[in-house]
Amino acid sequence: MARRCTLTFKGSMIGNHVSHANNKNKRRLLPNLRSIKIQLDDGTTRRIKVAASTLRTMRKGA
């Protein structure tokens, strides 16, 4: 399964490890995903993966 937020579609990015000697090596920057249970309108619960920043926004709105 992809490392992607199911609500905002935030995914991984490509960056560099930079050493003190300014050597650069490729790395992946992964989103901070959390698995939460959410209740749908019909009463069923479903488990989804959400980024931590999205979870903060959801809690602020509630």
Curated annotation (Swiss-Prot):
It comes from the Bacteria. Keywords: Ribonucleoprotein, Ribosomal protein. GO terms for cellular component: ribonucleoprotein complex; ribosome. SUPFAM superfamilies: L28p-like. One of its GO terms (biological process) is translation. The keyword Phosphoprotein does not apply. GO terms for molecular function: structural constituent of ribosome. InterPro entries: Bacterial_rp_bL28, Ribosomal_bL28, Ribosomal_bL28/bL31-like_sf, Ribosomal_bL28_bact-type, Ribosomal_bL28_sf. Gene3D superfamilies: Ribosomal protein L28/L24. Belongs to the bacterial ribosomal protein bL28 family. NCBIfam families: L28 (TIGR00009). PANTHER family: 50S RIBOSOMAL PROTEIN L28, LARGE RIBOSOMAL SUBUNIT PROTEIN BL28A. This is Large ribosomal subunit protein bL28. The gene is rpmB.
